[in-house]
């Protein structure tokens, strides 16, 4: 977490002089967060039902997908807008950005947006995607997707995108609140089991993640990112 925070703090200034390095650094450190979460899973899966919770299930699935890199999925929104294409290519386009708010009202200041239809392509058997995760059987995959949809309220995001006529590939989901929610749940389970948090980083994050932060997965918040002809893209509430 600390490395991602530090990279995020440097992002704005570095982006002004080297957008590619700034975006690469941020994306790679987010992948490091996912790898660290997988390590957390390895050592604590006996203490917490990872696959019974939508947030932890999504993180492990996205981590595995990015780790194996046998598909073109899960490029960040920053990468798509500024590196995969020129920003001018999107002049006049709108993107629907979905995120999960906190219950204490103070928003999470960092974000990592990926296409929602990438998540569907990887996890939803009904999409019949060539990039579908085939590690689990079809019946289990259906139940997994149903649990994710129910707990993260993804159908509400898809419905809003359809109603407002957003192309499917312009609907994005913020993984950062999902990550925070997942870590909070696991840390609380570990604390309840009497696991000691040792080391500077562990001690620093133990308190906020076990007693201060809580994410509301039941009510996704929606914003619109509008790409204009002048200046940077603008984000507004919808």
Task: Give residue spans per PLM region.
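Long, hydrophobic/aromatic-enriched structural stretches that serve as scaffold segments
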Residues: 18-48
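Acidic, Ser/Thr/Gly/Pro-rich intrinsically disordered interaction regions
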Residues: 1-27, 50-238
